């Protein structure tokens, strides 16, 4: 079996950036043929189209499907982005070794067998008969190249997904198999590969530059690119040679409108078929129409108010606990979100590995909040809550309600500062904790469905987005990183969640719902991980 050694990845670097890339978790979770300018390699090119495309609206004998999101992609390189919307757009054309069903379970992808070896490595057996959109066969060397391009910064690009596959130390191939070794033991290797690691063709990538790769596509997925208008629309046609059968959709288009009201109006005008993030106040208008309905699902995203432990008054655990008692999250879910949310009490969502069912939410108790503020020594504190504008479902309205409730305490005043997400995320992801905001409304998506992928990046001392340093919590998370017994690992993560609840580095808010408007002409079910898979849609 031929082998090549790869560069060593330091384990503390993995702890620092564990989980999905920072911007993905915050922003996120989620191809191609034709006569493009690619000169005959089967890729779509620039603004050219061989498939006609569609601006949306299903009808007639041709199944045309339009999807309208809040934002477009940042380019079509599936390994060079860190946003959920880009993953949705590229994920129609590219796919990984493993996949997930809509409930989050791990299923086969480009690999139809997978196993852990005695030394802790993981081995994937590739399915036969898979071809790229240009007609070339998928090989184990393509998979090896793709993993290395993501993980190692000297293989073409510095990928923002560098740590998404864990502490990879070596990738070897042989006889239709790919073996991935790690620096230490990786207990969630298969979870990571079920969410990350889109595969590209090595020769195609090496032949073209970054600009070309970001405007064209050559994957193995169910759809081929037919037209790409940067920032405007992406059009696809079915991959008739797809290994799992061609999708029913004949013409797929993905576009965006940042205004939720505009998206809803397009849906009701039958100009598109699926729209994302329908505001709760628009739900009744959609449901009462004759052309569309609401389809919602509890997502893998948690919303919270993050407090930096090293600045006053948030340096006091009592003050942080007081903020949890000061915010009436249940009322916010009912009145601001129209019930589209679930109360949370810990960083790990129900159904994810490590969730602790014994932890109860902090009760809304302004008197207790005022008492704890007095005990903290920070009576009279003046604080400012920063919130993104339009990134999460009703984020500004949620933040305003929370700030008002805190401000109503007799011994704390709270103001609200609204910020564009593109600006705020730069501060939140600053390399040093000293440069991060003090008090911020944020969301985090955990597409791996494993508690460590929220706890480690957000709350460990070396976490990429941490606002906390606690030796006991660090010890638990490091133990969870290396424990091979799955039951023991669950116990460790449950203990870590209890400690995080008690330390109260966040005001624990809610589990966000994904609320979609869906045309009555189609049948389509949303997923918990926020990925949109049009290949599962059917005509009514």
Regions found by a protein language model. Give the residues of each.
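Haloarchaeal acidic low-complexity proteome signature biased toward cell-envelope/secretome components but also
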Residues: 1-62
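Ligand/substrate-recognition segments at binding pockets and active sites
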Residues: 65, 374-445, 459-461
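Aromatic- and charge-enriched surface segment that lines or borders ligand/interaction sites
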Residues: 113-155, 313
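Detector for C-terminal structural segments
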Residues: 2-5, 9, 16-20, 24, ...
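Surface-exposed binding/hinge segments that line
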Residues: 115, 162-205
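Append "and occasionally in soluble cytosolic enzymes with long acidic Gly/Pro-rich linkers
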Residues: 44, 315-404, 408
């Amino acid at each position: 079996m031929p082998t090549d050694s790869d560069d060593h990845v330091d384990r503390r670097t993995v702890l620092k950036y564990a989980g999905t890339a920072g911007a993905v978790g915050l922003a996120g979770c989620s191809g191609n043929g034709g006569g493009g300018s690619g000169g005959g390699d089967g890729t779509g090119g620039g603004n050219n189209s061989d498939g006609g495309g569609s601006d949306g609206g299903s009808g007639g004998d041709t199944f045309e499907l339009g999807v309208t999101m809040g934002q477009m992609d940042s380019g079509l390189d599936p390994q060079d982005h860190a946003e959920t919307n880009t993953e949705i757009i590229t994920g129609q054309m590219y796919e990984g070794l493993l996949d997930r069903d809509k409930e989050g379970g791990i299923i086969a992808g480009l690999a139809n067998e997978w196993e852990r070896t005695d030394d802790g490595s993981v081995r994937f057996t590739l399915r036969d008969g898979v071809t790229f959109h240009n007609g070339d066969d998928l090989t184990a060397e393509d998979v090896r190249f793709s993993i290395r391009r993501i993980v190692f910064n000297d293989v073409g690009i510095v990928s923002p997904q560098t740590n998404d596959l864990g502490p990879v130390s070596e990738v070897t191939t042989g006889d239709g198999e790919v073996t991935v070794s790690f620096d230490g033991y990786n207990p969630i290797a298969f979870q990571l590969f079920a969410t990350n690691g889109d595969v590209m063709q090595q020769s195609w990538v090496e032949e073209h530059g970054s600009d070309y790769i970001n405007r064209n596509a050559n994957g193995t997925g169910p759809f081929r690119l037919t037209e790409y208008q940067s920032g405007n629309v992406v059009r696809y046609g079915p991959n008739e040679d797809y290994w799992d059968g061609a999708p029913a959709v004949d013409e797929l288009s993905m576009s965006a409108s940042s205004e939720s009201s505009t998206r809803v109006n397009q849906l009701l005008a039958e100009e598109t078929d699926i729209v994302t993030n329908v505001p709760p106040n628009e739900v009744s208008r959609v449901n009462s129409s004759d052309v569309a309905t609401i389809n919602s699902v509890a997502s893998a995203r948690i919303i919270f108010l993050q407090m930096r432990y090293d600045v006053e008054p948030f340096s006091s655990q009592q003050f942080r606990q007081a903020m949890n008692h000061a915010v009436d999250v249940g009322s916010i879910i009912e009145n601001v979100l129209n019930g589209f949310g679930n109360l949370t009490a810990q960083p790990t969502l129900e159904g994810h590995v490590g969730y602790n069912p014994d932890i109860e939410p902090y009760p809304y108790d302004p008197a207790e909040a005022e008492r704890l503020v007095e005990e903290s020594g920070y009576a009279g504190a003046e604080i400012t809550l920063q919130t993104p504008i339009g990134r999460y479902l009703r984020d500004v309205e949620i933040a305003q309600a929370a700030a008002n409730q805190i401000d109503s305490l007799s011994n704390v005043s709270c103001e609200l500062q609204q910020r564009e997400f593109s600006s705020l995320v730069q501060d939140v992801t600053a390399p040093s904790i000293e440069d991060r905001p003090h008090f911020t409304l944020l969301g985090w998506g955990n597409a791996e469905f494993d508690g460590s992928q929220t706890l480690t990046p957000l709350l460990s001392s070396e976490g990429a987005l941490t606002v906390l340093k606690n030796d006991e919590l660090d010890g638990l998370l490091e133990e969870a990183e290396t424990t091979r017994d799955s039951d023991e690992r669950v116990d460790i993560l449950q203990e870590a969640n209890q400690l995080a609840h008690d330390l109260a580095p966040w005001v624990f808010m809610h589990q966000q719902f994904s609320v979609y408007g869906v045309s009555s002409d189609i049948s389509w079910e949303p997923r918990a991980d926020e990925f949109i898979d049009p290949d599962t849609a059917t005509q009514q």
